[in-house]
Amino acid sequence: AYRNIRTCIECGVAAVSGTTGWTDRLGELQELCRERGGALFYASNYCLGVNLMFRLNRQLAAMIDRVGGYDVRIEEVHHTQKKDAPSGTAITLAEGIVENLAGKQGWVNLAPGIEHAANRIERSGEAPADRIEIRSVREGAVPGIHTVTYESEDDVLEIRHTIKNRRTLALGAVVAAEFLCGKQGVYSMDDLLRNA
C-alpha cells in the first residue's frame, strides 16, 4: 500500500487509502505531500459510524482513566475470508485507549493462528495487565462487529458498532474523496468529521 500511495502522490494524483500496516511511514508521506503539493486521505475504516465510535472510544477512555477501577478489552468479529487479525479498526480502537488510559501500554491479540505484525505479544491465555486484550473472531459472512468492553467489579460498560453491509465503507470512501478535492496535505476521518 505504501508504494502505491507514494506513486500516486509522485504522479500528482490524490490518494484515498483504507489499508493498514503502513502508517509507521506516514511521516514520509506527509513530507512528500509537502514537497509535491500532494494530497492523501487515510483511515483504517471508512464507515462514518465507526469513526464516530473512535471519537467516543477516546473520550470514554479518558473518563474511565479519571474514574478508575475498570479494565478494558476489545472483540472484533469478521467474515472467514478476512486474513489479518486484529482488524485495523480494532487496532485504532486500542490505540485510542492507550493514548487516554494510564496503565495501558499496548495491545495483545489472543486469536490463535491469526497474526498481525505490529505491537503483538506472542501469548495465549490472558493479556498482561498493561495490555489491552483484542479477541479476533472469524465466522460466516459478518462484515464487521467491534465491541469495546470496560468491566469493573460492579458493572460492565460496552460500546459496539455493527456494519450491516459493506456499502457504508464505499460511501465513506466517496465522502473522503470529495472532501480531499482541491486540498493539499494529509487528512484523516478526524479532519472530515471536524469539518462536518
Where do the model's predicted regions map?
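A generic structural signal for short
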Residues: 17-18, 82
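C-terminal substrate-binding/catalytic lobe of Rossmann-fold NAD(P)-dependent oxidoreductases
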Residues: 68-196
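Rossmann-fold NAD(P)-binding glycine/threonine-rich loop
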Residues: 1-11, 18-43, 48-62
